[in-house]
From Swiss-Prot:
Domain of life, source organism: Bacteria
Family: Belongs to the gamma-glutamyl phosphate reductase family.
Pathway(s) where this gene product acts: Amino-acid biosynthesis; L-proline biosynthesis; L-glutamate 5-semialdehyde from L-glutamate: step 2/2
Gene3D superfamilies (alphabetical): Aldehyde Dehydrogenase, Chain A, domain 1, Aldehyde Dehydrogenase, Chain A, domain 2
GO CC entries: cytoplasm
Gene name tied to this protein: proA
Coiled-coil regions listed: none
Keywords, in A-Z order: Amino-acid biosynthesis, Cytoplasm, NADP, Oxidoreductase, Proline biosynthesis
PANTHER family linked to this entry: DELTA-1-PYRROLINE-5-CARBOXYLATE SYNTHASE (PTHR11063:SF8), GLUTAMATE SEMIALDEHYDE DEHYDROGENASE (PTHR11063)
Name of the protein in its database record: Gamma-glutamyl phosphate reductase
Catalytic activity, reaction form: L-glutamate 5-semialdehyde + phosphate + NADP(+) = L-glutamyl 5-phosphate + NADPH + H(+)
One of the protein's GO biological processes: L-proline biosynthetic process
Gene Ontology terms for molecular function: glutamate-5-semialdehyde dehydrogenase activity; NADP binding
Localization (cell): Cytoplasm
Amino acid sequence: MDIKDYMQNLGCRARKVSRVLARAGAEEKNQALEMAASFIEKESQALVEANHKDLAAGRSKGLDEALLDRLTLTEARIAVMAEGLRQIASLPDPVGAISELSYRPSGIQVGRMRVPLGVIGIIYESRPNVTADAAGLCLKSGNAVILRGGSEAFHSNQAIACCIHQGLEQAGLPQEAVQVVETTDRLAVGALITQEEHVDVIIPRGGRSLIERISQEAKIPVIKHLDGICHVYIDDRADLDKAVAIAVNAKCQRYGVCNAMETLLVAREIAAEILPMMGEHYCSAGVELRGCPETQGLLPHIEPATEEDWYTEYLAPLLAIRIVAGLDEAIEHITHYGSHHTETIVTEDFTRARRFLTEVDSSSVMVNASTRFADGFEYGLGAEIGISTDKLHARGPVGLEGLTSQKWIVLGNGHIRE
């Protein structure tokens, strides 16, 4: 198989059917999603059997238990995957929505219409449920999609795609609307991210090395985030009960997610009061702490934090703690070491909260709330394709609207420009 020719063929077919999807109605798209969900439930045993092939191959390659868990499809996870497609079907269709329509002095009406991006390439690792989630979101937003999953989930992804294709067929939509790359050759990634004539945007979901490679080599716009180095700053005017609850939840609810806190900043004026309490909570949760010299003075049992720690997304029960003079130093630290993902201030001071919201340059900035809320579902977007820390085109959780663009529309009645 010539990989370049194969990928060009996928791109060409995707571009062709993207025009069909752009004019498809919400009823057709929703029917396809509902039918795909039904086929996923109906074929659950076939999905489990395909997944067993991937798990056996993974074990033979020595994949660790965490990776194997992300790879595993159970009956319960398959049911959640099907329900996810139904939830996407229940969301409002963004395509065709007109906004900001107004009359101009010339008499014309000018507004903006939401339209699909066209063809989306999604490159991801391990989790086979991404195949269904990504296909569903792209379909509902009127986009054709080319999915390149991780080689470790090859059989699972193909089986899920088969169910989605059946759903598309039942709804009278082309199966090429969702194409899964049928090769594990790594050259396929390079061929996909350089197809500027066929593919409009690339969305990578995976580890830092994958995203860095795609960012450097792609000839197509990329929607991405590299790291989730999220901060919680406890101000000296914070409610201590709120501060403890937020800082514990932000770190301990789930470790291996991009919106978990990785660095805790504490105002010097309240550090002696709150850090011993925080230390007890983290110790009981099994979180390893690393701190600046001042923090070590209050928590002598912890390890020293290095310069590298401030730049690290742990995705593990590890936390770096730094005592800062106040809000200015906290913002300076976040600006220098942060990844523009999610930051929170805990304070009862309205002016300081407004300053934090205004001056911190991240995709989500919060007041008195856990960083774990940085999520499309929690924001009312429904499902999300990922979180973007870029400033163009989408920023923060990327849901259906983030997979569309806008074009200007002008309505006249024989108007000519004088």
